């Protein structure tokens, strides 16, 4: 047998051996996809469930910036866990826990809470004590109108309908989508990704008190439509309803 023939046989044998140990369609050692309820890595869980609203890396989007140090200073783990598990009624924040109709296990919720907490830092606080996450007393909408003029009108306009540097915050569609708690968080922590100041920065050297935050939130809440999403009374709607049968 010639050397060429022997070499050919060896090559064929090697190829046959490799083919037997690596059958077509056989997954590699690192190619298996975990079932959704077994994914525990924070970055994956956040990207799949949170980033769409709260931004990549918690930078903010339609929802508030979860990486904001002020938010993490006032929202403890139980607050974050409850909102993640059960959602926030009356807002676009859904429930993620399986026990509340979502897709995540309790352990996955814990992984998200721990991951978010790892973002906490004292950066930007400078030993300041922000108002608490939850209001201590009910807000006074009438006084809130005065608070608004003092702290907010320079950006959002005298009536809240928008100014030179900020949009309307009394838009009925907007107020229908956010809760009082969301408004409170926004007043306290601001929206740094949008250039909105926190509770200390509206008037340098004069931070808002807890009661002032509660009062301005009450004033904003008083501007909500009673039945969001329904036709609002105006002359055009009245004329239409007068001449059409509407079931």
What are these regions (language model features)?
Residues 17-19:
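C-terminal motif of bacterial Sec signal peptides marking the signal peptidase cleavage site
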């Amino acid at each position: 047998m010639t050397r060429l023939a022997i070499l050919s046989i060896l090559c064929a044998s090697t190829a046959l051996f490799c083919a037997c140990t690596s059958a077509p369609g056989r997954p590699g050692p690192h190619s298996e996809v975990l079932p959704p309820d077994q994914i525990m890595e924070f970055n994956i869980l956040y990207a799949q469930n949170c980033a769409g609203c709260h931004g990549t890396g918690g930078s903010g989007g339609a929802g508030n910036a979860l990486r904001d140090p002020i938010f993490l200073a006032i929202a403890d783990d139980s607050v974050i866990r409850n909102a993640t598990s059960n959602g926030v009624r009356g807002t676009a924040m859904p429930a993620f826990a399986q026990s509340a109709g979502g897709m995540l296990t309790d352990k996955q919720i814990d992984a998200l809470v721990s991951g978010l907490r790892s973002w906490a830092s004292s950066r930007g606080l400078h030993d300041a004590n922000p108002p608490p996450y939850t209001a201590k007393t009910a807000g006074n909408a009438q006084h809130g109108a005065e608070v608004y003029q003092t702290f907010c009108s320079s950006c959002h306009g005298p009536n809240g309908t928008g100014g030179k540097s900020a949009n309307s915050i009394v838009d009925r569609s907007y107020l229908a989508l956010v809760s009082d708690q969301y408004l409170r968080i926004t007043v306290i922590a601001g929206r740094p990704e949008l250039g909105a100041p926190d509770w200390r920065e509206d008037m340098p050297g004069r931070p808002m008190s807890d009661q002032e935050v509660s009062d301005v939130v009450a004033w904003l809440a008083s501007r909500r439509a009673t039945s969001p999403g329904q036709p609002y009374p105006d002359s055009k709607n009245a004329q239409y309803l007068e001449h059409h049968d509407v079931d």
